[in-house]
Regions:
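Surface-exposed acidic/polar loop and edge beta-strand patches at domain peripheries
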Residues: 1-165, 169, 173-352
Length: 352
């Protein structure tokens, strides 16, 4: 953490640090509004993926000096629907663009009573509606103690833990909702590559394939059972799947080898199938209701695995112009057998 913090400071990207009562350290980068690092007590090993350009001041300076998307890594907040907000020529898919008002945005740090929040006031353009919508995104952080700390019959000796709660809010700030605009929060975590994403489901649910840039996802890497989707994220290129809100249980995990140990990262969040989940397949824009996504990236953007979830939209037809989301990240690192047991308890799955 010290090296990453120093590099960012040297290139004019200062960080903030949230410390939990259990010793967890959460490294926040206001530039882009991201949680860039998650560290267990006494550990300098980041649970999250960060861009390799951040390994030195020279490469970081060159990276942030470019006009490309500055994908620093970690846990970020975007907005849906992707078709409107990232494809300026939709339904043509010839150009993908991260609106700079959103990422990196212009997040401001607000400090109060020893805590802090990040606030981004922005306007985004909807390509299909040909409308601009003024918004406000606010993010803050709190503790998330080990969910297994009171459980009996499990030996957590030798297992590192780090966790936090992220509070995210979205508001339409104009006096009226422009046109028929609906917009939803979309939170994404980037993790080291080569692991398995584990998506528990209430019943058997076949994931929707969104896109592949090279070939497709081999059937042996995308396994569906009655109560679990397992995506082995090891393909070349970029690949994405999406899962229905009515099926998912509100937890998604990612397990991968970490040196001599294994790491398990779990996101715990609220799913409301009565809400409007507006991120739709690009070829079927009236097919609403997808809440969870997984994206495998092994391309010029880097090598990482993304765990993504959506929050029901606000705006036209929803009766709301403001929403709040609260979600936890629970991260474990330790011997494989113990991490498997944790995965079984919290997700109904293990690394096998």
């Amino acid at each position: 953490m010290k090296k990453l913090t120093q590099v960012l400071k040297l290139v004019g990207k200062p960080t903030k640090l949230f410390k939990s009562s259990d010793g967890t350290r959460v490294l926040v980068l206001p530039y882009g509004g991201r949680v860039l690092g998650l560290f267990a007590p006494g550990s300098e090993e980041n649970f999250y993926w960060t861009h390799t350009a951040l390994n030195s001041p020279e490469s970081a300076r060159e990276f942030y000096g470019g006009d490309q998307w500055h994908n620093s890594g970690g846990d970020r907040t975007w907005l849906a629907p992707e078709a409107d907000l990232f494809f300026p020529n939709f339904p043509k898919l010839d150009k993908y663009f991260q609106q700079r008002s959103l990422d990196p945005g212009k997040y401001k740090v607000s400090e109060y009573d020893g805590a802090f929040s990040l606030v981004n006031r922005l306007t985004v353009s909807f390509s299909r509606l040909k409308k601009d919508v003024p918004l406000k995104i606010t993010k803050s952080f709190g503790p998330a103690l080990n969910p297994l700390r009171h459980e009996r019959g499990i030996d957590l000796g030798g297992v590192e833990y780090a966790g936090y709660t992220q509070y995210t809010s979205l508001a339409i700030t104009g006096s009226n909702v422009p046109g028929k605009a609906q917009v939803g929060l979309w939170n994404l975590v980037q993790m080291p590559p080569g692991g398995d994403q584990l998506i528990p489901t209430f019943a058997r649910s076949e994931p929707r394939h969104i896109f592949s840039t090279i070939d497709t996802i081999p059937p042996r890497d995308l396994l569906t059972s009655d109560h679990l989707i397992r995506y082995r994220m090891r393909q070349k290129g970029e690949h994405k799947i999406s899962v229905r809100a009515v099926s998912v249980c509100g937890r998604v995990g990612y397990i991968h080898p970490a040196g001599d140990n294994w790491a398990l990262i779990i996101r715990n969040f609220v799913v409301n199938p009565s809400g409007e989940y507006v991120d739709v397949p690009w070829s079927e824009t009236d097919y609403f209701g997808f809440a969870v996504q997984a994206c495998n990236v092994n391309s010029g953007l880097g090598q990482f695995s993304e765990l993504e979830y959506h929050i029901p939209a606000i705006g036209h037809g929803t009766g709301r112009i403001h929403c709040d989301d609260e979600a936890q990240v629970w991260a474990f690192r330790g011997p494989r057998a113990k991490v498997d047991q944790i995965g079984q308890m919290l997700l109904g799955a293990n690394s096998l």
